[in-house]
């Protein structure tokens, strides 16, 4: 019953914001129209809004889980139209906080001790509140300032109920929408379910932060807060408290004397290093999660502060290599290579003609190269390439789509800090240096050295394994020879059977013909009372039947 009321509310909100137009021609749209008389008249202001804005407003009204749904949907540019994706990026994940006393109970249950024994001070008024969790300031007994992230009470059940409802809606859309094969609604919901499941485990988020901190511990480009593991559990995450300026607060950055030009270049370098050196990148890098260190001593050498580690990205080694090669091919305007890489990577089927892909890549990239370099977006070029490649049955892993969205965010932050930022000039040497290091003989030797214990462990078994493999090959060949002989014998048997069947059919036919000729008494030669042709036909037919019987 609860699910029914929730579904009715969703339908009501969809009609209020004219989202039935997104379901044109489907059974779902017809059902929604039946409910129109029970929905207040749609205001002219809403009607005039774009479909993307109407969807964004509807998701905000439906509540925090649907806001999160919209945010995740905005990262899947391969599944949603560009105008809708651009609007969903603006969704704000801000909701009313829950009671501080409730937060204390959750913390005590998760950590197995009282708040007083865990913290010298705990502020029950949250610093920030979002759909999944909220953050409180606290001080440890050793006087270190920390922030405590606490999951919302009963959030797992709320998400489970809404996901179940979304799955039902996705199934309905898949069976009724004419473009369901392009929208792939069930794939979208599955992606949302996976992402939300990861965000519900704060211990996992702590592990992400810890790994990222280890990669950048000695860096002047970005700082990752320390995880306080003694105060962290599945529903509670405690981190070192950071003070900084949001990267989109340009006025405050200027007032603090921060070198924005140096900062913007660092952002691009950090991203490419995370992707191609560490293979572990912050995949939710919008301005709210990327701050700038406000330490006055860092005005001329500023650094970023990373926050919120719920969504991290990793690529397979194969995708990592082909993506890097794609970037280099774009830098060199080598459209043939771009086309070849898409096929070699398995993103596009082998049967697609390289020449067609090359022409498509040229049509995408050339218009961008007529602009000044400072106005070229590598993320936009990549997104357009993938969009065009969808015509050729493009298949991409979700992590690649996540990277594309992150690159778009990073470039946006960089251009906000420095509108004249030349991403190509900054990114190219970083990428070339990382690729040279990654595929150098030294790196190969390092990888070999890393795997040496494993190699040495299995080395004594190698001769036996080789001998076993050779024996299997010989046995397999013998077995194949036996099978071949059996097949040949069977083929000969079938050929003989075929000949006997033919002889039997011919013999029967000739005997029938002999009988008919005998009965008709045709003109011509006779041997006694028997027509010669009847006699010949009968003899040949009898011989053919005897041949078929004798061979059997």
From Swiss-Prot:
Pfam families reported for this sequence: ABC1
EC numbers: 2.7.-.-
Top-level EC class: transferase
Active-site residue numbers: 284 (proton acceptor)
Sequence positions that bind ATP: 127-135, 149
CDD domains xrefs: UbiB
Pathway membership, UniProt: Cofactor biosynthesis; ubiquinone biosynthesis [regulation]
Assigned protein family: Belongs to the ABC1 family. UbiB subfamily.
Role, per record: Is probably a protein kinase regulator of UbiI activity which is involved in aerobic coenzyme Q (ubiquinone) biosynthesis.
Record protein name field: Probable protein kinase UbiB
């Amino acid at each position: 019953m609860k699910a029914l009321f929730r579904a009715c509310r969703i339908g009501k909100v969809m009609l209020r914001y004219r989202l039935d137009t997104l379901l044109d021609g489907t059974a779902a749209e017809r059902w929604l129209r039946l409910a129109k008389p029970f929905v207040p008249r749609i205001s002219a202001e809403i009607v005039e809004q774009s479909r993307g804005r109407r969807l964004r407003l509807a998701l905000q009204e439906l509540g925090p889980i649907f806001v999160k749904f919209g945010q995740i949907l905005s990262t899947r540019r391969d599944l949603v139209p560009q105008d809708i994706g651009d609007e969903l990026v603006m969704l704000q994940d801000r909701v009313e906080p829950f009671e501080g006393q409730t937060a204390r109970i959750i913390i005590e249950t998760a950590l197995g001790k009282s708040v007083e024994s865990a913290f010298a001070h705990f502020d029950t008024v949250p610093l920030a509140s979002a759909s999944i969790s909220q953050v409180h300031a606290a001080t440890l007994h050793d006087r270190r300032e920390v922030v405590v992230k606490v999951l919302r009470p009963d959030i797992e059940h709320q998400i489970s109920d809404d996901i179940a409802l979304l799955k039902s809606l996705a199934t309905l859309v898949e069976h009724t929408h004419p473009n369901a094969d392009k929208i792939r609604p069930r794939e979208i919901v599955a992606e949302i379910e996976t992402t939300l499941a990861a965000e519900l485990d704060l211990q996992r988020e702590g592990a992400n932060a810890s790994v990222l901190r280890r990669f950048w511990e000695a860096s002047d480009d970005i700082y990752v807060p320390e995880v306080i593991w003694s105060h962290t559990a599945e529903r509670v995450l405690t981190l070192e408290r950071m003070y900084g300026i949001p990267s989109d607060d340009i006025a405050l950055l200027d007032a603090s004397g921060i070198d924005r030009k140096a900062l913007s270049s660092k952002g691009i370098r950090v991203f490419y290093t995370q992707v191609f050196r560490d293979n572990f990148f912050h995949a939710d890098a919008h301005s709210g999660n990327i701050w700038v260190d406000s330490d006055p001593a860092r005005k001329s050498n500023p650094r970023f502060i990373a926050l919120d580690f719920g969504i991290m990205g990793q690529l397979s080694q194969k995708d990592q290599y082909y993506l890097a090669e794609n970037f280099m091919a774009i830098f060199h305007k080598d459209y043939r290579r771009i086309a070849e890489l898409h096929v070699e990577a398995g993103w596009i089927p082998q049967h697609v003609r390289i020449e067609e892909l090359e022409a498509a890549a040229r049509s995408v990239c050339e218009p961008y190269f007529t602009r000044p370099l400072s106005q070229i977006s590598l993320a936009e070029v990549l997104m357009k390439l993938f969009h065009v490649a969808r015509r050729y049955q493009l298949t991409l892993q979700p992590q690649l789509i996540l990277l594309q969205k992150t690159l778009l965010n990073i470039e946006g932050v960089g251009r906000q800090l420095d509108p004249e930022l030349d991403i190509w000039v900054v990114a190219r040497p970083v990428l070339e240096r990382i690729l040279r290091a990654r595929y150098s003989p030294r790196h190969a030797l390092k990888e070999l050295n890393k795997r040496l214990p494993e190699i040495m462990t299995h080395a004594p078994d190698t001769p036996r394994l080789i001998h076993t493999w050779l024996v299997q090959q010989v046995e397999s060949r013998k077995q194949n020879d036996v099978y071949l002989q059996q097949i040949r014998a069977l083929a000969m048997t079938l050929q003989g059977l075929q000949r006997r069947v033919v002889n039997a059919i011919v013999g029967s036919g000739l005997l029938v013909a002999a009988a008919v000729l005998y009965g008709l008494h045709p003109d011509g030669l006779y041997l006694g009372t028997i027509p010669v042709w009847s006699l010949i036909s009968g003899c040949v037919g009898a011989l053919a039947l005897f041949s078929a019987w004798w061979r059997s």
